[in-house]
Amino acid sequence: MASLPDTNKLLRNFSRCRNWEERYLYMIELGAKLPPLTDEQRQPENLIAGCQSQVWILLRMNHQNKVEFIGDSDAAIVKGLVAIVFILFQGKTTQEILDLDVTEYFGKLSLEQHLTPSRTQGLHAMIHAIRNRTSKMV
């Protein structure tokens, strides 16, 4: 995966932003760190249902039994949300992903209070899809 900050650095960087315009710019910057997917990876089975923008997420198990993520979106802010979701789940086992309470992190980032309803719905769709796909890897 791209060089993304860990959750603590994400929270710290978010808190340093003076307003939500800066936070959106930071989210776009995070999304830009995700490498683009190939045409072969942009297949319907990798699309996330429930997102207004097109979002593709792929999962694979590495040799340390940790789940690795690659993903993309056709919208810059949504791609930043994909990166944030990956930051929360990176380096975790399937069970840790299934057990993680993401609402705590989203609360600390104040994400849901500042996203449009359709982006919030898409964010939840990403989490649901990742957990669903992760449960099939167990």
Swiss-Prot record:
InterPro entries for the chain: Cysteine_desulfuration_SufE, Fe-S_metab-assoc_dom
GO terms classed as biological process: iron-sulfur cluster assembly; sulfur compound metabolic process
Cell compartment(s), UniProt: Cytoplasm
- Gene3D superfamilies per record: 3.90.1010.10
The keyword Hydrolase appears for this protein: no
Q: Which UniProt keywords apply?
A: Cytoplasm
Tagged with keyword Thylakoid = no
Give the GO cellular component terms, alphabetically: cytoplasm
Q: Name one Pfam family in it.
A: SufE
Please name the pathway: Cofactor biosynthesis; iron-sulfur cluster biosynthesis
Q: Where is the active site?
A: 51
Major place of localization?
cytoplasm
Q: Kindly state the subunit structure of this protein.
A: Homodimer. Interacts with SufS.
UniProt record similarity statement: Belongs to the SufE family.
Q: Extract the PANTHER family matched here.
A: CYSTEINE DESULFURATION PROTEIN SUFE, SULFUR ACCEPTOR PROTEIN CSDE
What job does this protein perform?
A: Participates in cysteine desulfuration mediated by SufS. Cysteine desulfuration mobilizes sulfur from L-cysteine to yield L-alanine and constitutes an essential step in sulfur metabolism for biosynthesis of a variety of sulfur-containing biomolecules. Functions as a sulfur acceptor for SufS, by mediating the direct transfer of the sulfur atom from the S-sulfanylcysteine of SufS, an intermediate product of cysteine desulfuration process.
Q: What is this protein called?
A: Cysteine desulfuration protein SufE
